[in-house]
């Protein structure tokens, strides 16, 4: 995986520069706060005793995150530069109050370390985002609101294709709502005007980003669209059968 390009700290500033709508976001590079933090987090995960420097790093880390949370406000959306692990919603990215912040940080850090057994996902970049107001069609994965999202693929200045973000198989045995399939089918359709809006933003982004990329568009409760995530195309899930699956 291309961790450097996929990191939110790489693509978000470019979107902001373009004037593309994105959630209010605060980003912190913990390597600049205390270079001992990331090694200390990995040490704790592997059940090793923290030393004095490790404890100092953790204290700084907590202080920075709590300050970020205070500025954004609760509830907030938590992620690293690489992932939010949103399928564990209540235990990772959704932070209802400051009392739950460090618990969710720990869960997200553990997931990141285990995600790649060679080295783990990078965990130096930590992000808090304003929780967008939504009107979910249904909930899944223990309370995660499922709303309208679409993924675009771009390459060298052009739009290759567009797909609904959520395939139906993603919700197998994960939803209590008996009518979720019909709701999903309805929300996975774009009107012609909506496609024009998203195409316009995607083309603007495609002109800025070189190579093969995915763009995730998200609609809030007031029917406004924004970009919530990007990644290199080869590191992004692509609907089966699409001829642009490999760019």
What is each of the regions a protein language model found here?
Residues 26-31, 213-219:
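Acidic carboxylate-rich catalytic motifs and surrounding loops in phosphoryl-/glycosyl-chemistry enzymes
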Residues 94, 211-212:
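Residue-level preference for alpha-helix termini and adjacent loops
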Residues 154-158, 220-223:
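Short acidic-glycine loop/turn motifs at beta-strand connectors
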Residues 189-196, 200, 207-210, 219-247:
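C-terminal active-site "lid" helix and adjoining low-complexity regulatory extension at the edge
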């Amino acid at each position: 995986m291309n961790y450097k390009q996929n990191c939110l700290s790489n693509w978000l500033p470019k979107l902001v520069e373009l004037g593309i709508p994105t959630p209010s976001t605060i980003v912190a590079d913990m390597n600049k706060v205390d270079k001992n933090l990331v090694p200390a987090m990995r040490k704790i995960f592997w059940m090793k005793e923290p030393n004095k420097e490790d404890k100092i790093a953790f204290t700084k880390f907590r202080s920075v995150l709590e300050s970020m949370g205070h500025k954004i406000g609760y509830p907030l959306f938590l992620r690293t530069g690489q992932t939010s692990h949103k399928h564990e919603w209540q235990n990772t990215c959704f932070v209802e109050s400051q009392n739950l912040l460090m618990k969710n940080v720990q869960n997200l850090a553990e997931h990141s370390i285990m995600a790649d057994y060679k080295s783990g996902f990078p965990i130096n970049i930590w992000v808090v985002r304003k929780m967008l107001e939504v009107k979910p069609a249904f909930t899944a994965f223990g309370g995660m609101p499922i709303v309208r999202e679409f993924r675009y693929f771009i390459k060298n200045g052009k739009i290759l294709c567009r797909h609904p973000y959520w395939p139906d198989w993603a919700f197998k045995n994960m939803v209590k709502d008996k009518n979720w399939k019909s709701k999903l089918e309805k929300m996975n359709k774009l009107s012609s005007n909506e496609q024009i809006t998203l195409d316009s933003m995607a083309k603007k982004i495609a002109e800025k980003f070189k190579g093969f990329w995915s763009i995730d568009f998200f609609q809030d409760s007031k029917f406004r669209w924004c970009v919530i995530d990007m990644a290199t195309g080869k590191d992004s899930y692509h609907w089966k059968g699409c001829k642009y699956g490999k760019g």
